[in-house]
Amino acid sequence: MQLLTIGINHHTAPVALRERVAFPLEQIKPALSTFKSVFLGHPAPNAPEAAILSTCNRTELYCATDDRAARDAAIRWMSDYHRIPADELAPHVYALPQSEAVRHAFRVASGLDSMVLGETQILGQMKNAVRTASEAGSLGTYLNQLFQRTFAVAKEVRGTTEIGAQSVSMAAAAVRLAQRIFEQVAQQRVLFIGAGEMIELCATHFAAQGPRELVVANRTAERGAKLAERFGGRAMPLSDLPARMHEFDIIVSCTASTLPIIGLGAVERAVKARRHRPIFMVDLAVPRDIEPEVGKLKDVFLYTVDDLGAIVREGNASRQAAVAQAEAIIETRVQNFMQWLDARSIVPVIRHMHTQADALRRAELERARKMLARGDDPAAVLDALSQALTNKLIHGPTSALNRANGADRDSLIDLMRGFYQHAPRSSDTSDH
């Protein structure tokens, strides 16, 4: 069984491409079904195991398969699924086989591959991806084991290193950028669009600045109101956004919409109504919530997740000692997992040996029963049974020894010594 990870992330692709390859939550189960039934075309039980991790910064397909051509086929599947030309997508895709796939999973869950070094959000996102794959019936022995060990490694790394200490989060970076535009965030009106985990983190950081007003707009009014209440703000219907956008100095958006919810025309009208007072906008969604053309407007300062990356990286450099410690832990755990994987490769052989031996046993047992039924001496029947089983069980090894020559024979003899502890050494088999 081969492990394989196919993906793109913030290291290999810009947000303009990442948003085209992202999987909305409701599409993941159907996509996994397509992958299993169409991509490799294998009927159960040989269908590949698969899980999809899709976040703002990465889209990754983890799979376990017997197909040796899985790498190219997986990239082709991703290209076809998202209707992106293969020659456009391929340069940005990484394909990680076996131990590289294991190492990558461990690093991702531990926060070592994140834009925000050591951030914890990715671990929850990976657990959700595994839960979704499990519900879709696309997990099996290999990926289950990979992810269970992945979560254990992440816990070990975070518990024994300082990888997450004093990390500069995306939310904190957004506040820093806002302070470059507005000297006092406390004097500004802030609007959050969405009510998910990222918006909650951003609201926490902006609320700490004591803004003049804090408003949450969300498709689900109840959830938006609950979040706003936590921070002493108020909620507004998302449908009011076009008419009221001009009221806000700072707008932070992160929804699960597959299409932009803030267009160029709406922002142009807001800027005009504000008499060209600046608007600071942060788009943390992938796919993006705000049309990219908005960033070209004179009085609009629009930042995406990639733009916030530079500020985040400034805080990452000081924690390289923790990174080295985490990498050492991960490398040890990768080796442990690969030992388990190697051991799994002999399971089919052992199973076949048991099946074959049991078939021999059943055949000889039936033969012995027939002998007893016709009145043969029980002692003679037992002796014949034991002789027949002995001859058939050692037939394979003795035939292999007889066919072997030279060094191969010596190796086989030494191997047989391990099987049959009292067998003579190969050096003792020559005539004296």
Curated annotation (Swiss-Prot):
Coiled-coil stretches: none
Top EC class for this record: oxidoreductase
Catalytic activity: (S)-4-amino-5-oxopentanoate + tRNA(Glu) + NADP(+) = L-glutamyl-tRNA(Glu) + NADPH + H(+)
The keyword Zinc appears for this protein: no
Top-rank lineage group of the source organism: Bacteria
Site (Important for activity): 104
A Pfam cross-reference name: GlutR_N
InterPro entries found in the cross-reference section: 4pyrrol_synth_GluRdtase, 4pyrrol_synth_GluRdtase_dimer, 4pyrrol_synth_GluRdtase_N, GluRdtase_CS, GluRdtase_dimer_dom_sf, GluRdtase_N_sf, NAD(P)-bd_dom_sf, Shikm_DH/Glu-tRNA_Rdtase
Subunit structure: Homodimer.
Other noteworthy facts: During catalysis, the active site Cys acts as a nucleophile attacking the alpha-carbonyl group of tRNA-bound glutamate with the formation of a thioester intermediate between enzyme and glutamate, and the concomitant release of tRNA(Glu). The thioester intermediate is finally reduced by direct hydride transfer from NADPH, to form the product GSA.
Entry remark concerning the domains of this protein: Possesses an unusual extended V-shaped dimeric structure with each monomer consisting of three distinct domains arranged along a curved 'spinal' alpha-helix. The N-terminal catalytic domain specifically recognizes the glutamate moiety of the substrate. The second domain is the NADPH-binding domain, and the third C-terminal domain is responsible for dimerization.
Protein name as annotated: Glutamyl-tRNA reductase
Organism: Burkholderia thailandensis (strain ATCC 700388 / DSM 13276 / CCUG 48851 / CIP 106301 / E264)
Organism lineage string: Bacteria, Pseudomonadati, Pseudomonadota, Betaproteobacteria, Burkholderiales
